[in-house]
């Protein structure tokens, strides 16, 4: 409702351009080197730099987006991530922590230590359950019972305004290949299970590439339903410059074999509208119609601005033509007519294959190129009953990577329990 109110206010005011979501990158340091990500290469000269906490909070106030997506880099590495999350929540903003999942359990253990010190009777049953389900070790439980190492430091606690947004690009084998490390998928599953037990909201984000098996994505969503995951976002893999250069130079691979063209996106997303009815996808049905090739949209990258260590990134999350000191300068000085695809013609060659969510979802949300019935369609999609998949895939299909190779069926079964 907060986002709906934000949209209505700007429409009544006749605002030409405004932010709907802030992509906040407080740092670009990461603990993984994912295939298809160009951030590390693009910002290689400033990998050790971080945004001051004050600048992060000021950026949210400056653009006044109702939702902030904290990304990077890996945001849980940011030294003041707890203060940042709590600061944004105090501003009454919806917060998504976009994480690879590797540090999630660590941050939740910090939360448990503070909670146990305050309400041991309430937290003890949770600790017992987490221990029984192998989500905490006995030594971790004992450490939690000793209380927080730094009692004055804030923690990330469950909130109706916050989501863990976990990156998952497929089932175990596929995801571990893409993030270039075995065991990451398994850790994500453990972290999501722990989060749901503790009362956190959990979402996932998935990028579809040329070699992605669409059936595998459906199995992924069906499996995540057994964990109680609240919803998903899904977007096509776009061949932006930094990612292409990283793939070619670091991995010696041809980006054309990995990323999607516009035509290939439509082929991969042919069932997108069906997914919207079967799975709890976040966003709009209008965007799903767009990626399925059923309608046209123009890019509105100005609605999802990116703020990072160098300033306000222009023109969008993927393309970099410069950085601006203020949000106002970004909105007023960028010639937005130079970008996007209009009537099948790319205004900029780099935009030709882009159909990504952060460029086109806001167009669907705001109602650009709207059709009769779109508003009610979007309202029902977001506020009506959420679909819950009934099919539950065999754990052997889900854990088809290092788990299968290690041949540990007992451990596999524990992880698979919802």
Which residue stretches match the model-derived regions?
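Conserved alpha-helical substructure of the radical SAM core
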Residues: 1-161, 367, 409-410, 418
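Alpha-helix N-cap/loop-to-helix initiation residues
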Residues: 77-78, 104-105, 210-213, 323
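Conserved residues at the C-terminal ends of beta-strands
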Residues: 40, 71, 167, 235, ...
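The −1 position to Zn-ligating cysteines in a subset of zinc-ribbon hairpins
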Residues: 29, 33, 298, 350-353
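Short glycine/proline- and charge-enriched loop/turn segments
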Residues: 38-42, 172, 247-254, 330-335
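Residue-level marker for beta-strand->alpha-helix junctions and adjacent short loops that shape enzyme
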Residues: 44, 75, 102, 171, ...
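Radical SAM enzyme [4Fe-4S]-AdoMet core and its adjacent flexible, acidic
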Residues: 51, 94, 121-126, 130-133, ...
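Flexible mid-to-C-terminal extensions adjoining Fe-S/redox cofactors in radical SAM and related proteins
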Residues: 18, 313-418
């Amino acid at each position: 409702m907060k986002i709906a109110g934000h949209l209505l206010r700007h429409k009544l005011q006749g605002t030409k351009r405004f932010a709907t979501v802030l992509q906040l990158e407080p740092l670009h340091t990461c603990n993984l080197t994912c295939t298809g990500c160009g951030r590390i290469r693009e910002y290689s000269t400033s990998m050790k730099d971080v945004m001051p906490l004050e600048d992060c909070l000021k950026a949210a106030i400056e653009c006044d987006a109702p939702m902030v997506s904290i990304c990077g880099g890996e945001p849980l590495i940011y030294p003041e991530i707890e203060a940042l999350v709590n600061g944004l929540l105090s501003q009454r903003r919806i917060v998504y922590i976009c994480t690879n999942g590797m540090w999630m359990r660590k941050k939740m253990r910090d939360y448990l230590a503070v909670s146990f010190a305050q309400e041991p009777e309430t937290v003890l049953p949770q600790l017992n359950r987490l221990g029984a389900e192998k989500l905490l070790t006995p030594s971790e439980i004992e450490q939690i019972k000793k209380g927080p190492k730094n009692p004055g430091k804030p923690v990330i606690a469950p909130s109706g305004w916050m989501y863990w947004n976990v990156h998952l690009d497929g089932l175990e084998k596929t995801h571990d290949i893409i993030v270039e490390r075995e065991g990451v998928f398994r850790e994500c599953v453990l972290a999501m299970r722990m989060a749901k037990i503790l009362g956190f909201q959990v979402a996932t984000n998935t990028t579809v590439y040329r070699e992605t098996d669409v059936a595998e994505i459906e199995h992924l969503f069906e499996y995540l339903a057994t964990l109680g995951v609240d919803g998903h976002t899904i977007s096509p893999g776009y061949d932006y410059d930094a990612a292409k250069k990283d793939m070619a130079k670091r991995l010696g691979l041809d980006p054309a074999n990995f990323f999607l063209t516009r035509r290939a996106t439509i082929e991969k997303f042919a069932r997108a509208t069906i997914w919207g009815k079967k799975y709890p996808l976040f966003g709009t049905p209008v965007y799903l119609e767009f990626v399925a090739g059923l309608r046209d949209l123009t890019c509105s990258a100005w609605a999802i601005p990116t703020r990072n260590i160098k300033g306000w990134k222009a023109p969008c999350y993927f393309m970099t033509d410069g950085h601006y000191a203020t949000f106002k300068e970004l909105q007023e000085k960028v010639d937005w007519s130079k970008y996007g695809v209009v009537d099948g013609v790319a205004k900029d060659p780099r935009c030709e294959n882009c159909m990504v969510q952060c460029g086109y979802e806001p167009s669907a949300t705001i109602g650009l190129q709207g059709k009769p019935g779109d508003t009610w369609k979007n309202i029902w999609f977001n506020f009506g009953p959420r679909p819950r998949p009934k099919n539950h895939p065999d754990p052997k299909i889900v854990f088809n990577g290092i788990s299968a190779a290690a041949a540990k069926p007992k451990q596999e079964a524990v992880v698979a329990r919802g």
